UniProtKB/Swiss-Prot annotation:
Family matches, as PROSITE patterns: JMJC
All copies of domain JmjC, residue ranges: 112-274
Organism for this UniProt entry: Dictyostelium discoideum (Social amoeba)
Listed name of the protein: JmjC domain-containing protein B
Gene for this chain: jcdB
Xref: InterPro entries: Cupin_8, JmjC_dom
TM segment ranges: none
GO MF: 2-oxoglutarate-dependent dioxygenase activity
PANTHER family the UniProt entry points to: HYPOXIA-INDUCIBLE FACTOR 1 ALPHA INHIBITOR-RELATED, JMJC DOMAIN-CONTAINING PROTEIN A-RELATED
Pfam families for this protein: Cupin_8
């Protein structure tokens, strides 16, 4: 059996409240992930969005959203059109199917997940609840893109790379995140990572834990973290990463972690905001 224990690195945490642009770009230039534990603790979204009715009252009962599974097997073929209020209700009540028509358990990456939700463009009032773009230098990142990600219980994204420098902040629930550096991504066995589920703790019986997962046998390092409510993770461009949305019962992750915020989530819903810093020049030339 493979043993990856010595390869696993817990992503560093910065506990400063005020994150200056200079410090942020220091991490960016070093091309290393970092968690800012207090950057977003005063965001109104952390309290307002805890009540899903706040979101529904603004978005409306009949607003249709494109919920897509996260297998990245073709964005459009997996899209499910559903009322936003219905998606929230089914997520809260855990009403999405756990087994397919053949009785096989549905993989995490095939569970419904509302990602890249353009709620800030469609409903600008939500802008006042967050404040993520202040960390970006507009001379270096002259295009800031903000999207919401709302996950049903146990949903996940397969390993992928973003199209910009991403600051992802958890508003509700938790996320188990695995990251592989650009230098190591060629050694990641993507096929095995798709075929064999990744279990994030001893209570997650679906798959194999990182320590023994064959997809990482040739990787030099495996970065991991449990990103909690109010924490922000900087994901540098070109880092390959996997994200698993954690339910309210799955908060026993790491007894040695000193962060007092657990993953208690009283209605089986995980919400996060991604704020990408991009360069229009790079998008045009690249």
């Amino acid at each position: 059996m493979f043993n990856n224990t010595n390869k696993i690195i817990e992503i560093e945490r910065n506990n400063n409240k005020n994150i200056e642009k200079e410090l942020f770009y220091k991490y960016l230039n070093e091309n290393e992930p970092i968690i800012f534990t207090k950057f977003s603790t005063d965001w109104e979204a952390l309290s307002k969005w805890n009540d899903p009715n706040y979101l529904i009252n603004i978005i409306g009962n009949d607003h249709i959203v494109d919920v897509n599974k996260c297998s990245f097997g073709g964005y459009y073929k997996d899209i499910i059109k559903i009322k936003f209020s219905e998606f929230i209700s089914k997520s809260i009540n855990n009403q999405f199917d756990n087994f397919d028509l053949n009785g096989n358990k549905i993989k995490k990456v095939n569970k419904p997940y509302l990602r890249n939700f353009e709620m800030f463009e469609d409903f600008p009032i939500f802008e006042q609840d967050i404040n993520c773009d202040i960390i970006f230098d507009k001379d270096k990142h002259n295009l800031i893109v903000k999207r919401a990600f709302i996950g049903s219980v146990g949903s996940a994204t397969s390993f992928h790379i973003d199209t910009g420098d991403n600051l992802v902040t958890v508003i509700k629930g938790c996320k188990f995140i695995v990251m592989i550096s650009p230098n190591d991504s060629k050694f990641l066995d993507f096929q095995k990572s798709r075929e064999i589920e990744i279990s994030f703790n001893q209570n997650d019986n679906d798959g194999i834990p990182l320590e023994y997962h064959p997809a990482f046998s040739n990787c030099k390092y495996i970065y991991k973290t449990l990103l909690r409510k109010g924490e922000s993770l900087f994901i540098p461009n070109n880092w390959t990463h996997y994200v698993h949305n954690i339910s309210d019962h799955d908060d026993n992750f790491n007894e040695d972690n000193n962060n007092n915020n657990n993953c208690n989530n009283n209605n089986n819903l995980t919400i996060s905001v991604s704020c990408w810093g991009k360069s229009i020049y790079d998008l045009v030339v690249g």
